[in-house]
Amino acid sequence: MKQLRDRMINVRDQFYKSRRQKGFMSFWWSSPTHVVLVLEVAIANASSKSINFETIVKLLPSSMGSRSTIATVLDDFVARGYMSKDIGKDKRKRVYRVCEGSMDLINDWFTKRDFSLKAVS
């Protein structure tokens, strides 16, 4: 149980640290909807795929928020420069991409978390 306790403490501390930071990390962790939206867009980007608003709405459980909530959060990410909204192959649809700097921060977060979880295991 001590090992599980240490892991939970580590995850909690990482979460608090991310929330205290300014910029992308704090905004990313501001709600479960923010976290999941970034992950869905980042997963698509890392897979060299494009993802548009309609696809995102279909992927997210309805408990994550309404269409307007999802649109507002995505627009906030774009307005802050953490994501971009570009024209896709189908000229009628706009696709979302996580900006390179934000993707680097996500990668760093996962790398640090993986390392710290190994340290307590």
Regions found by a protein language model. Name each.
Residues 63-79:
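Short amphipathic alpha-helical interaction segments
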Residues 78-88:
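A short, conserved structural fragment
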Residues 101-121:
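Short, amphipathic alpha-helical interaction segments positioned at domain boundaries
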